[in-house]
């Protein structure tokens, strides 16, 4: 099938990763043309050129889902969050989520011990092979995104179908946090896995992405 005949899968990774994060998932998505935004944690940011005439399924992992809601770089036909959230930290009327103080401590410690903070976060995610080089200032800037962004209103305004894939054992985005963010807004499909579903269970994710697209 020619690229012009295939829908486009738009992928955005989360904090501490890069465009290569989705490679295990992309291997299962041959019926899509896959393009990936790179947020610049390991080098220069990469923003693909979008064709507004193409049909898009947008997929954000973790913070990448908030990035899509905030920036909406192209009109899409469906939106999927994996291990995702519309807001990362707790606030009045929104809990459970990550305590504000936890993120404040990460921000305070980051410029003094960026390697340690990054490695600790990756270990919590279940990733024992964190990036071996990264842009400290860009990573610190994106910690502020996690602290400040609140895309609940953007999610409520979303006009296209929204789907959520979540891990029952996710140590970053707990099941209760997932439900707080999406209950009554989007259907949630659960896997027993943790925070890195696209790399740990790419076939499972691919099946659900394809089913979501077919349902549009």
Predicted feature residues:
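Short beta-strand immediately N-terminal to the catalytic nucleophile in serine-hydrolase-like folds
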Residues: 58-60, 82, 165
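Conserved alpha/beta-hydrolase "acid-adjacent" motif
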Residues: 171-177
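Short beta-strand/loop motif that positions the catalytic acidic residue
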Residues: 158, 164-166, 170
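Gly/Ala-rich beta-loop-alpha elbow adjacent to hydrolase catalytic centers
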Residues: 59-68
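Catalytic histidine-centered segment of alpha/beta-hydrolase-like enzymes
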Residues: 193-207
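Conserved alpha/beta-hydrolase catalytic His-Asp/Glu region
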Residues: 109-156
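Flexible "cap/lid" loop of the alpha/beta hydrolase fold
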Residues: 73-109, 136, 141, 145-148
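Conserved HGGG/HGGXW glycine-rich cap/lid loop of the alpha/beta-hydrolase fold
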Residues: 2-45
